[in-house]
Amino acid sequence: MKKIALKNAARGTAFDYAGQSWILLENDDGRALCLSKDIIETRAFDEGNCNNFAVASSKEYLNGAYLDNLLEDVNGPNAFLTTELDLTTDDGLKDYGTCTVTIFLLTVDQYRRNRDVIPNADDWWWLSTAFSTKSNGYESLARLVNTDGTLNGNYACSGYYGLRP
């Protein structure tokens, strides 16, 4: 694949970076929101069955070992920028607030906004949005995307679904 300048690229453009294939979803003020073209691995949203991405084991993995491996393939730590991720739940509750991350799973809102340029995956994959919160009786259900692109949800401890940062 040839080199491209993301600031000039169209939404939906596929490109290779840091040893992976990515899809450009959004460009805004010199920042690009990208999604891995493929699921990187199958893993629980959270091994402790908590649907709050701010404390989820998947967030720790993506911003730990996974990010470290990506950084080995690029020039320096500024290759990936931090983001303030809005963790508003699917039913609109704001109990989980926001979290600052570098690598993350899309929110339901980001997914919906960019669905037209996101290709379906071969398996189901997690989003960072919770179904609802502990205060509303739902501390374990997290949202995910089916193979046909429709939204679903399941228990955060389920290890059958993919991570697609």
Give the location of each predicted region.
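Collagenous Gly-X-Y triple-helix signature in extracellular proteins
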Residues: 1-164
